[in-house]
Amino acid sequence: YSVPENKSNREVFVMNADGSENQQITRTPYQENEVTWIKGGTKLAFLSNDNGSSQLYEMNPDGSGRKQLTNYDGDIEGYSISPDGKKLLFISQVKTKESTADKYPDLPKATGIIVTDLMYKHWDEWVTTAPHPFIADFDGNGISNIVDILNDEPYESPMKPWGGIEQLAWNTTSDKVAYTCRKKTGLEYAISTNSDIYIYDLNIKKTENITEENKGYDTNPQYSPDGKYIAWQSMERDGYEADLNRLFIMNLETGEKRFVSKAFESNVDAFVWGADAKVIYFTGVWHGESQIYALDLANDSVKAITSGMYDYEGVALFGDKLIAKRHSMSMGDEIYSVALDGSTTQLTQENKQIYDQLEMGKVEGRWMKTTDG
């Protein structure tokens, strides 16, 4: 971030899994983001706006060999490459409403907004488009045969205003995509929190709603590594944005669904499957701290892995360890490696030069009994 220019710019850094050899590999005026390893770990894929629109690029792990992979007619806002590496799932906006200039072509310079229905605005964004998920063939150098999963439907997936690629997921065999969608419009859309998880079959071009009976938010699907289950976050009631965020799984063969996080009396936030599909790791808030937990699917028991006056955000599996961001009242976000016994290793030291000049205050917890004990 540049204070004189009042402008930020994202760059890409890489490091070894133990935190060593942390280095910046891009130094450009563009916005590199959503970086993932591809092609067996030999390349990095990322989004950037080099040529004015956000497109998919690749580069070597040292930052060399920067190459544009897509030239889509629109911004790519998120993406996921299929497990077999042959398909690209990406998000892009489609026009869903006529502008004033569309309605009155004799007034091409008109900037006024004509509002006749909800939802006409999300925070600071006028609603004129909707994000749609697209699937394309991907040969490693470009895309072809692009298909809009929602076709001409006026809905959004992922959901505005905060949803991203985490609301969509490939299955293990690369022939199905699970996506989050609230298939409502107008006033009904504006007052409802009833989204569902849909599964789109690439082979037969059909979509199935797997959460129709639940009336609250169903979001963020993830397939298990063995391909036998799908997990997602679920709220029970329509219209309650702050309802309990529960974790559900479904057996893809039998269709049996199970509320697996009953033992945790708080929201399930970020989650990731264990490599053996027998455990799910997740972050959740308890007593003012966001810790990492392990959910044993054999008996749905929950065990805290981390402790302390910290907040963990996001969680990824790396071998026999978890990788997560952590911050506290005394420290901004840094990346940590977390062993399953709860021991942690700080991998980044992005703000050390600042903290070394400061004497931080002591932070303590205080708990008081309420009238009901």
PLM region spans:
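Conserved beta-propeller blade repeats
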Residues: 29-47, 66, 73-88, 120-133, ...
